[in-house]
Amino acid sequence: DPELSRGLGDVYKRQGISIVDSRIGVLGLTFKENVSDLRNSQSPMIVNELKKYGAKVLAHDPYISDQGLLETHGIELTDWQDQKDLDAVLVLVPHDFYLKEKRLALFKTLKAGGIFIDVKSAFDRTLLGGNQQYWSL
């Protein structure tokens, strides 16, 4: 959904931050939670749209094989350990991996002043640091 990418760009503008070269962790790329099916998923389009804006996108999904995503959509998946020092975290699909296993670690991936975008309003915003921002649809 290009609107989501533009929305993130608008949030950045209001904060006086440039999206160019910002590190954005995009988490959960499949069609729905806890499955490996990418058919009908808008996530690859969102990742590619953010890249067009000049963002450094660190895509992660525990259910997708890296090779398949590269071949199909031209997106390289990153390891969970690479999700650090992020200017923004964009959770598109809240897999249990993020909600349960990495719930607390997820908020620590953000820099001070970072933006946490929770598309499906699945996370407890009170877990964010005081200078981090929360945004959801």
Question: How would you describe each model-predicted region?
Answer:
Residues 107-137:
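ADP-ribose/adenylate-binding Rossmann-like module
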Residues 73-86:
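Short acidic low-complexity segments
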Residues 1-12:
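Single conserved hydrophobic/aromatic residue that forms the stacking wall/gate
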Residues 30, 92-97, 120-121:
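Short glycine-/small-residue-rich Rossmann-like dinucleotide-binding loops
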Residues 13-24, 82-84:
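Glycine-rich phosphate/diphosphate-binding loops that line cofactor/substrate pockets in enzymes
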Residues 7, 84-86, 112:
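Alpha-helix C-terminal capping/helix-to-coil transition sites in glycosyltransferase folds
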Residues 33, 96-101, 124-125:
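Short glycine-rich, flexible loops that bind phosphorylated cofactors or substrates
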Residues 25, 33-71:
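NAD(P)-binding Rossmann-fold cofactor-contacting core
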